[in-house]
Amino acid sequence: MRDLKTYLSVAPVLSTLWFGSLAGLLIEINRFFPDALTFPFFSF
């Protein structure tokens, strides 16, 4: 039961950090490449 409580307290923290960093990454990509349907660093 203690392991379940540990999991339930760790999972929201990790998911918040993950989604927060993902949102920050997407915001920075949109700041440097606004309105990009295809990203310039993938084109040859």
UniProtKB/Swiss-Prot annotation:
Entries under InterPro entries matching the protein: PSI_PsaJ (IPR002615), PSI_PsaJ_sf (IPR036062)
Subcellular location field: Plastid, Chloroplast thylakoid membrane
Positions of disulphide bridges: none
Transmembrane regions: 7-27
Main location: plastid
Keyword Membrane: yes
Record key words, sorted: Chloroplast, Membrane, Photosynthesis, Photosystem I, Plastid, Thylakoid, Transmembrane, Transmembrane helix
A GO CC term assigned to this protein in UniProt: chloroplast thylakoid membrane
Topology term for the membrane: Single-pass membrane protein
Biological processes, Gene Ontology terms: photosynthesis
Pfam families, A to Z: PSI_PsaJ
SUPFAM superfamilies in the record: Subunit IX of photosystem I reaction centre, PsaJ (SSF81544)
Annotated family: Belongs to the PsaJ family.
PANTHER family listed in its UniProt record: PHOTOSYSTEM I REACTION CENTER SUBUNIT IX, PTHR36082
Function: May help in the organization of the PsaE and PsaF subunits.
The protein, known as: Photosystem I reaction center subunit IX
Gene behind this protein: psaJ
